[in-house]
């Protein structure tokens, strides 16, 4: 029997968007109600997806600016990134293209990205928006638009609190590494027609 493939999966995104809760929810099937650490301890587990066993290594990062110099150290050897934003934070949504994509393209060019919208349970919670009048929900269509803009392999909305789509996020990350999307041929055609004499 062959050894399972190791996949390094790194979470990135603004502080307080729910990266650590997503990892805790996935690895323990529970939602942390009291203390949530800034960074989850690295975790690895054997996971079976579509009949293939992989050893999934999960790396958490801190989104706060204090960690800007340290964070890229965890990018080395990454097979896939989970780029998270909160579905109730327009700023975290905007920072995906303003801050995170430039950082990932600089330190880890070519590594596939799964775009993840977190806190799905709160987007439909009317009371949350009454209590937080400045909060602006991000729609599924806006998430899909952002996925296309940044060239992410997939876009998934999830809730760590209700566990909705949590497994789907990590399954998508594993699948994009095991079965990379085929490169589109459009680029080659465009390059052929761009000869300037």
Swiss-Prot record:
NCBIfam families to which the protein is assigned, alphabetical: small_GTP
GO cellular component, one term: cytoplasmic vesicle
Family: Belongs to the small GTPase superfamily. Rho family.
Binding residues annotated for GTP, in chain numbering: 13-20, 60-64, 118-121
GO MF term list: GDP binding; GTP binding; GTPase activity; protein kinase binding
Lipidation residue positions, type S-geranylgeranyl cysteine: 194
Organism: Oryza sativa subsp. japonica (Rice)
InterPro entries linked to this entry: P-loop_NTPase, Small_GTP-bd, Small_GTPase, Small_GTPase_Rho
Propeptide regions on this chain: 195-197
Disulphide bridges: none
Modification Cysteine methyl ester occurs at: 194
Domain of life of the organism encoding this protein: Eukaryota
GO biological process, one term: regulation of cell shape
Protein name, UniProt field: Rac-like GTP-binding protein 5
Membrane topology recorded in Swiss-Prot or TrEMBL: Peripheral membrane protein
Function recorded in the entry: Inactive GDP-bound Rho GTPases reside in the cytosol, are found in a complex with Rho GDP-dissociation inhibitors (Rho GDIs), and are released from the GDI protein in order to translocate to membranes upon activation.
UniProt-annotated location(s): Cytoplasm; Membrane
Record keywords, A-Z: Cytoplasm, GTP-binding, Lipoprotein, Membrane, Methylation, Nucleotide-binding, Prenylation
Signal peptide: none
Pfam family, one: Ras
Positions occupied by motif Effector region: 35-43
Coiled-coil regions listed: none
């Amino acid at each position: 029997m062959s050894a399972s493939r190791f996949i390094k999966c790194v979470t990135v995104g603004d502080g307080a968007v729910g990266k650590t809760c997503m990892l805790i929810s996935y690895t323990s099937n529970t939602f942390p109600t009291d203390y949530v650490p800034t960074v989850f301890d690295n975790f690895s587990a054997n996971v079976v997806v579509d009949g293939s066993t992989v050893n999934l290594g999960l790396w958490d990062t801190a989104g706060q600016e204090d960690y800007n110099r340290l964070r890229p150290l965890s990018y080395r050897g990454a097979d896939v990134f989970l780029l998270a934003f909160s579905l109730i934070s327009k700023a975290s949504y905007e920072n995906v293209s303003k801050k995170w994509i430039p950082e990932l393209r600089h330190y880890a060019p070519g590594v596939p990205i799964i775009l993840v919208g977190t806190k799905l349970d709160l987007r439909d919670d009317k009371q949350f928006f009454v209590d937080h009048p400045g909060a602006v929900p991000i729609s599924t269509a806006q998430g899909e638009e952002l996925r296309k803009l940044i060239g992410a392999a997939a876009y998934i909305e999830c809730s760590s609190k209700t566990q909705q789509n949590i497994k789907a996020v990590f399954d998508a990350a594993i699948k994009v590494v095991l079965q990379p999307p085929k490169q589109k041929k459009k680029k080659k055609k465009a390059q052929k027609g761009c000869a300037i004499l």
